[in-house]
Amino acid sequence: MANPLYHKHIISINDLSREDLELVLRTAASLKANPQPELLKHKVIASCFFEASTRTRLSFETSMHRLGASVVGFADGSNTSLGKKGETLADTISVIGTYVDAIVMRHPQEGAARLATEFSGGIPVLNAGDGANQHPTQTLLDLFTIQETQGRLNNINIAMVGDLKYGRTVHSLAQALAKFEGNRFFFIAPDALAMPAYILQMLEEKGIQYSLHSSIEEVVPELDILYMTRVQKERLDPSEYANVKAQFVLRAADLAGARDNLKVLHPLPRIDEITTDVDKTPYAYYFQQAGNGIFARQALLALVLNADLAL
């Protein structure tokens, strides 16, 4: 069967159907079990990070190397011609597109990744995060981790906690889980950082249950997944940040009464919203979650760059 993701831009999780998501997750599981060190041996991939990143950039570049690809790019957009000389993003991408087989890009401006697709010369663009908008590859590793720990992606009770306004990971994850039946969402956030109305409207239109809460402890006994997020300091003014940064903090004691299968996830970096005593509980799974980024991103790269992928 032809691979539906071959040469496809991956900008939003909505670019992927449920069937596409399931294909990526099957491929990720296969690559985790059976490494393919020469799968992308003759490919060159650009890693273009116009915004700071640790886990996403390193896991993407590790994924590229472990599949045998050559990697070019930069980790700081301020040192490029765009940053130093005022070149437009359109011109930068137009040139990079002539050098490589795929472009992985992070940019602080919402919509930048979608814009890049118009100037890449048909070279596929993979969004590694654009402002507060979308982070589809984080969602793929989140889905992979949920499936790995729960054995399913349907009938999941998931709480999302913290900065639900600017946290692009929760926007993408809510949209992805809405493609699977029976999932229920519990949203816990300061009023100023509540889940955007368009996400709530999407859930309502699909008939998906959600509820708003003011504490973590009140919902813990009902949860399969507790998804913590940090407050996005870089997107708030200092006074706003001071008011909300410590409003929701998870401590080990808060997990009393949790189901045995509960896993605590976090896209990282963690600041102080999960205390270190949680790390020692059987519920903590955020470091393993980060490790799964390798396999989810390998799967996406493999599918986008291979017309007929059979693993």
From Swiss-Prot:
GO terms for cellular component: cytosol. Its EC number is 2.1.3.2. One of its GO terms (biological process) is 'de novo' pyrimidine nucleobase biosynthetic process. One of its GO terms (molecular function) is aspartate carbamoyltransferase activity. Pathway: Pyrimidine metabolism; UMP biosynthesis via de novo pathway; (S)-dihydroorotate from bicarbonate: step 2/3. Pfam families: OTCace, OTCace_N. Keywords: Pyrimidine biosynthesis, Transferase. It catalyses: carbamoyl phosphate + L-aspartate = N-carbamoyl-L-aspartate + phosphate + H(+). L-aspartate binds at K85, R168, R230. Carbamoyl phosphate binds at R55, T56, R106, H135, Q138, L268, P269. Coiled coil: none annotated. InterPro entries: Asp/Orn_carbamoyltranf_P-bd, Asp/Orn_carbamoylTrfase, Asp/Orn_carbamoylTrfase_sf, Asp_carbamoyltransf, Asp_carbamoyltransf_Asp/Orn-bd. Catalyzes the condensation of carbamoyl phosphate and aspartate to form carbamoyl aspartate and inorganic phosphate, the committed step in the de novo pyrimidine nucleotide biosynthesis pathway. Belongs to the aspartate/ornithine carbamoyltransferase superfamily. ATCase family. Heterododecamer (2C3:3R2) of six catalytic PyrB chains organized as two trimers (C3), and six regulatory PyrI chains organized as three dimers (R2). This is Aspartate carbamoyltransferase catalytic subunit. It comes from Serratia proteamaculans (strain 568). The gene is pyrB.
